[in-house]
């Protein structure tokens, strides 16, 4: 099959068994994507609660691993100390190890994959192959307003927003804009996300379902997510079953 050849799964039989078996057991293996400020955290809480999903955050897994004493820990610390990104192979291994501990449980993978190479690794892994891939779609200007309006109090650690949650007048002079909340940084992060999201979608044969969050309340977005999860899967069948050659 085309996908087995192109993405070279570690175990082709396990790959196929996982794909069809998860759907037969009605398991949710949800990948939730979205640009910075799209509201992934809010919707992840809704989904985890309603569908009893195990929440998987690659960032949290990396931080937890750094507090352990293992060969992987040493590798991660070495990359971090040099200011380098942790290789995809290590991140994928951490996710696979974590999923192995939760058995046949529904799970939500938060904000991953972020690149074409990560998507390819996810697709090639029988344990990580998702049943649903959903993107929370937001407008760049809305993200700039949402994140660019944040203000941080270095004394208390509290975060405010100049429009939605202004800081009290007595501390207004001491709140600051964090580096990640500068407009130029936000726009660059959005650009990188949008560029890579299209590549991720391509790896999964355009199986990413986008939910437009503009003008929608949190509850309305949650309802749309519920509708998507009412489907057995969003993954295009051509990922597993190759298209027949058309007769000339």
UniProtKB/Swiss-Prot annotation:
Region (NMP): 57-86
A GO molecular-function descriptor: adenylate kinase activity
The keyword Coiled coil appears for this protein: no
EC class (word): transferase
First-listed, main subcellular location of the protein, grouped into a coarse class: cytoplasm
Gene3D superfamilies named in the record: P-loop containing nucleotide triphosphate hydrolases
EC annotation from Swiss-Prot or TrEMBL: 2.7.4.3
Residues annotated to bind ATP: 37-42, 150
Residues at which AMP binds: 63, 84-86, 111-114, 118, 178, 189
Subcellular localization(s) per the UniProt record: Cytoplasm
Family matches, as SUPFAM superfamilies: P-loop containing nucleoside triphosphate hydrolases
Annotated region (LID), positions in chain: 149-181
One of the record's GO cellular component terms: cytoplasm
Reactions the enzyme catalyzes: AMP + ATP = 2 ADP
Cytoplasm is among the record's keywords: yes
Pfam families recorded: ADK
Keyword set, alphabetical order: ATP-binding, Cytoplasm, Kinase, Nucleotide-binding, Transferase
Subunit structure: Monomer.
Function in brief: Catalyzes the reversible transfer of the terminal phosphate group between ATP and AMP. Plays an important role in cellular energy homeostasis and in adenine nucleotide metabolism.
Entry's family note: Belongs to the adenylate kinase family.
HAMAP family the UniProt entry points to: Adenylate_kinase_Adk
Protein name per its UniProtKB record: Adenylate kinase
Organism: Giardia intestinalis
